[in-house]
Amino acid sequence: MKHGETDSYWGGIIKSMGLVFGDIGTSPIYTLTVIIALTKPTQDNILGIISLIVWTLIILVHLEYAVLAMSLSRKGEGGEIVLREILVRMIKPGRQMAFVTFLTYLGVALLMGDGVITPAISILSAVEGTLLIPGLGGLSQNTLILIAGTIALFLFVFQYKGTDKVARAFGPIMVLWFAALALSGAISVSSHPGILAAISPHHAISFLMHNGLPGFFVLSEVILCATGGEALYADMGHLGRKPVKRAWYFVFVALVINYLGQGAFIITHPDAKNILFGMLQYQAPLFYIPFLILTILATIIASQALISGVFSIVYQGINTRMLPLLKVDYTSNQLKSQIYIGSVNWLLLCLVILIMLVFRKSANLAAAYGFAVTGTMVITGIMMTMIFSRTTKKWKVPLALFVTLVDVVFLVSNCNKLPHGGYWSLILASVPLAVILIWTRGQRGLYLALRPLDLETYLLSYEQIYKKGRIAGTGLFFVKEWNIIPPYLVHCTIRSNIVYERNVLISIVRTDEPFGVESVLECGIGTGLDGFMIKAGYMEIFDIELLLKQNGIQEKVIFYGIEDIATTNPIWRVFSVIKKLTPNFVQFNKVPAAKLQGVITRVEM
C-alpha cells in the first residue's frame, strides 16, 4: 500500500470516528449506570447484562446497520428517505405506497425528536462527572444544569459559523476518546478476567429467563448502548461506506472492551453509583480531570454530529417536498453536507434546554430515551425486508426479519418507559410528523384547488396575445412543469397582457438521486416561448443565476406565484400559516430579489 493510500485509509477512519460515532461512542457514560440503578449487581446479573449489551451491539448495530442497511444506498447516500426512494421504484401506487410513505414520515419524525434528547442526555451525563472531583461533590443539581445549559448554548450559537474548520479536530479527539475507553476497560478486565464469559450469549438468555418481566424491561435500558447506531447508515454519504465500516470495527472493539471493564468494576465495587467515572477515578485519580474534559469534548462532538444530522434530514425533507421550505445557508465550500438551518437550530436549542430543565438528571432522561431509537430501527427493519424480498438478495430476507423481530422486542420493552417520561419521545416526534402530514396533504389539496391549464389550451390564448404586442426583453415565469400552466401565469400573460419578446417557463425538478445537476433548454414551445428545466438531486446545492447565464438567458424580470388561501377548515388554516411563515420557492432558491415580481392568486380550499 502506498503512502497516499495509507493516509486516505486512516484519514477516512479518523474522520468517521469524529462525524459518525459520537452518539454511540458516548453511550458508555450512562448506559450501565442507569441499568445498575434498576438491577441488583450480583455476578450473574452483571454477566447477563454485559452479555445483553455485547449482543445488542452485534445484532442491532453490526448486523442491522453495518451489514444489511449499508448494502442499500443511492449514490452512496443512506437513511430513511433513501430507503423510501429505493422502495418507490419497486412497488405500485396504492396501499403499499401509502404505508411506505407513512413509515418514512414516522421514521424522519422520530429521528428529529431524537435530535433533542441526545444532546441533553450526553452533555448532562458528562457534566455530572464533576461530582467525583474532590471538593466538588457538593455541587447542586441546579449548578450542573446551568453548566450543561451553557455548553449547549455555546454549541448551538456557533452553528451558523459552520463546523468545517472545527470538524478537523473532531476525529483525533474521538480517536483519543475510544482509546481511553479501551484502555480503561482493558485494565479493569485484567483485574477480573472472569467477565470475559459475558461474550457468550447464553448469559444474556439466562438473565432474561431467570428475571421474568423485570428482566424483559431491562432491555429498555440496554438499548441505550445502541443509540446512535443508525448514524452508520444515515451519515455514510458524508464519507463513504468503506471508511465508516472500517471505523466501526475499531469502535465496536473499544466499546465491548469498555463495557466488559465496567462489568468487572461493578463486580468488585458493587456500591459504585457512576460506573464509568468511578472506574476511571479508581484506576488513575491523577488523570480523572483530563478524562472528564475529554468526556465533555466527546459529548459536544456527539451532539454536533446529531445537529448536523437533523439539518441533513430537514434538507432532504425539503427537497423531496416532505417539509416546507426553510432558509438554508451553506457553510462550507468543500463539504456539501455542511449546511445551517437557523430556524431548526434555535428550535433545537430551546427544546434541549427545556428537556434539561424538565428531567434535571441524566438518569431521569434515560427513562425517556430509547423509544424513538427503537421505533426508527423497527421502521428500517421493515423497509429493508420489503426491499430484499423484491431483489436478487432474497437470502438477506431471513436476516432482515430476524433483526426486525429483535427491534420489535426492544420496542415493546420500551413501552414500559412511556409513563415515566418516554411520552416525551412521542411529543417531540409528533410535532415534525404533524407538520409533514399537514404539509404534504396541503400541497396536494392546493394543487387540486388551483385547477391549472394544460399547455395546449394555454397556447391558444397566448399566441393571440403575443401577436398584439410584447414588452422588450426576457421575462421568466416559475412553474412546476412546462406542460401544466399555473393560474398566476394565466392571470399575468392572458388577463393582464404581460408578454415579453422572450418568455421562459422555468421549472426545478428534484430527482430521486442524491446529487447531480443538469439543465435543459427547449426553445420554441410557442412563439417567443421557451422552457428551461433544472434537474437536481434532492441533496444538491446549485446556483440558478449561473445556470441561466450559462444557457444565454438574460432575464429582465422574474415572475412567481403566491397563493392566498381562504378556508374555514382548521387543517388548511394551519397549512396556510406554515406557508406564510416559511420562505417561498424563489426565496429558498436565492433568486435575485431586485428582478422579482410576486403575483397573488386567491385560492379557496
UniProtKB/Swiss-Prot annotation:
Key words, A-Z: Cell inner membrane, Cell membrane, Ion transport, Membrane, Potassium, Potassium transport, Symport, Transmembrane, Transmembrane helix, Transport
Keyword Transport tagged: yes
The reaction(s) this protein catalyses: K(+)(in) + H(+)(in) = K(+)(out) + H(+)(out)
Gene Ontology molecular function: any one: symporter activity
Membrane topology label: Multi-pass membrane protein
Family, similarity comment: Belongs to the HAK/KUP transporter (TC 2.A.72) family.
Free-text function comment from the UniProt entry: Transport of potassium into the cell. Likely operates as a K(+):H(+) symporter.
HAMAP family according to UniProt: Kup
Protein name (Swiss-Prot/TrEMBL): Probable potassium transport system protein Kup
Top-level taxonomy: Bacteria, Pseudomonadati, Thermodesulfobacteriota, Desulfuromonadia, Desulfuromonadales
